[in-house]
């Protein structure tokens, strides 16, 4: 099948004629053939198996460089590409990951990280994670499977657990093997255990923390839980002192003697440290006492009769509809009597009104009618107070003008508006004598 596909590429070989069955292949064709075969075998063996332990931190890095060779056109040897790549991870057959597994990738130009603490419920069950890589430039996709085989860690218990809050780290920075190794080394120097493992790492944002300001040195913060097989050291116990508890309640930094061993690289908030001793925890599990599985005798079951009496709803219908309808009808009749039968009428009102009041009212109506008739006549001369006093061009004082010798439609809208050439001049009234302003 592979040979057939190889020949479909287009006769990369040529007969030399020097011997039967002798083939000649160019170097470029040879390189293309080997790269194609390598790509096919890499896709066949793309599944990866990992074996984390239950209750111990699991970290798997999705490297962009590993997936770059999966997107066509396949890069040539020595060729460097920096395409943006994002990842989507989910449990096979489900839309999301298991509850204990988290994923983070800051930018399409950084590697993705799967991390979490496997639970004991999944021990012995392979967990298949589908990893889909997206090339944001070419829109090509590549899919790999990550098979997580969770191992049991009951033979190496870690009953003493401590959770630290590191203020100057982000979760992806803390997941780096070098940084996590430095932190575990500092904790081991303070705690002095025989075995020390990281149990879980959680971002402060997942605990309700605030998103930091976009400043260079501002970090989200991260919670790191570690477990050991020996009791807590005296330095870690200093947080439980009443003096340090009082300082923490006053939002002051407690005095810890071993803080200088972390301060060079990690800024720890000692007020948020949590110490858990599982050897002193009282088990709340109650053994279930199983009975015989027989229900107590409740007597003979009596089902309802098949012939049920039909219920008459006629009375309920009358009470529900007839009573409100009767009340509404009575109210309607009362309202009709008040509005129709209790009216006095105009004649009765005039008979009860004195004559002098009727005359006064009639005169008011007559005056109102005359004013309305006068307002309809628009041919009345303008009052002198509304005529212009100053000449619109020269600004000189002019005598009042009558409305019968000029056209009011050609008057300028503003007194400062100059007369245009096509505008008709307003005639002025000639005075017979000398006029004083």
Curated annotation (Swiss-Prot):
In both neural tissues including cerebellar cortex, striatum, cerebral cortex, thalamus and hippocampus, and non-neural tissues including quadriceps muscle, liver, kidney, spleen, lung, testis and heart. Widely distributed in the brain, with a robust signal obtained from regions with dense neuronal packing such as the pyramidal cell layer of the hippocampus, cerebellar molecular layer, and cerebral cortex. Levels are highest in kidney, moderate in brain and lung, and low in skeletal muscle, liver, spleen and testis. The lineage of its organism: Eukaryota, Metazoa, Chordata, Craniata, Vertebrata. PANTHER family: ALPHA-/EPSILON-SARCOGLYCAN FAMILY MEMBER, EPSILON-SARCOGLYCAN. Disulfide bonds: none annotated. GO terms for cellular component: cytoskeleton; dendrite membrane; dystrophin-associated glycoprotein complex; Golgi apparatus; plasma membrane; sarcoglycan complex; sarcolemma. Residues 339-437 are cytoplasmic. It comes from the Eukaryota. This is Epsilon-sarcoglycan. The chain crosses the membrane at residues 318-338. GO terms for biological process: kidney development; skeletal muscle tissue development. Belongs to the sarcoglycan alpha/epsilon family. InterPro entries: Cadg, Sarcoglycan_alpha/epsilon, Sarcoglycan_C, Sarcoglycan_N. It is found in: Cell membrane, Sarcolemma; Cytoplasm, Cytoskeleton; Cell projection, Dendrite; Golgi apparatus.
């Amino acid at each position: 099948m592979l040979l057939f596909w190889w020949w479909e590429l287009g006769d990369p070989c040529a007969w030399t004629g020097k011997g039967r069955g002798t083939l000649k292949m160019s170097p470029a064709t040879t390189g293309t053939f080997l790269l194609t075969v390598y790509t096919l075998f890499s896709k066949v063996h793309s599944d990866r198996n990992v074996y984390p332990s239950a209750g111990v931190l699991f970290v798997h890095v999705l490297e962009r460089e590993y997936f770059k060779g999966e997107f066509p056109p396949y890069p040539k040897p020595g060729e460097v590409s920096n395409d943006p790549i994002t990842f989507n991870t989910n449990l096979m057959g489900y839309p999301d990951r298991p509850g204990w597994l988290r994923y983070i990738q800051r930018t399409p130009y950084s590697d993705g990280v799967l991390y979490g603490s496997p639970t004991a419920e999944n021990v012995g069950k392979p967990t298949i994670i589908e990893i889909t890589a997206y090339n944001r430039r070419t829109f090509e996709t590549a899919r790999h499977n990550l098979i997580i085989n969770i191992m049991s860690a009951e033979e190496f218990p870690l009953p003493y657990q401590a959770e630290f809050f590191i203020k100057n780290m982000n979760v992806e920075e803390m997941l780096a093997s070098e940084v996590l190794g430095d932190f575990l080394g500092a904790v081991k120097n303070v705690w002095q255990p025989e075995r020390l493992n990281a149990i879980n790492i959680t971002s402060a944002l997942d605990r309700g923390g605030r998103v930091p300001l976009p400043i260079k040195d501002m970090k989200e913060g991260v919670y790191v839980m570690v477990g050991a097989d020996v009791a807590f050291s005296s330095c870690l116990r200093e947080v439980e002192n009443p003096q340090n508890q009082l300082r923490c309640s006053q939002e002051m930094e407690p005095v810890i003697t071993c803080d200088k061993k972390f301060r060079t690289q990690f800024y720890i908030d000692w007020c948020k440290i949590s110490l858990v001793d599982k050897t002193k925890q009282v088990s709340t599990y109650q053994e279930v006492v199983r009975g015989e599985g027989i229900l107590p005798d409740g007597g003979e079951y009596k089902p309802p009769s098949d012939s049920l009496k039909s219920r008459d709803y006629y009375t309920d219908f009358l009470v529900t509809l007839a009573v409100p309808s009767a009340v509404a009808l009575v109210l309607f009749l009362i309202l009709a009597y008040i509005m129709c039968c209790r009216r006095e009428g105009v004649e009765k009102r005039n008979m009860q009104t004195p004559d002098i009041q009727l005359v006064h009212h009639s005169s008011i109506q007559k005056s109102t009618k005359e004013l309305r008739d006068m307002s309809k006549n628009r041919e009345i001369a303008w009052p002198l107070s509304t005529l212009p006093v100053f000449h619109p061009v020269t600004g000189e004082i002019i005598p009042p003008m009558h409305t019968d010798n000029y056209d009011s439609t050609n008057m300028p809208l503003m007194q400062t508006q100059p007369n245009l050439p096509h505008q008709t001049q307003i005639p002025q009234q000639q005075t017979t004598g000398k006029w004083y302003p």
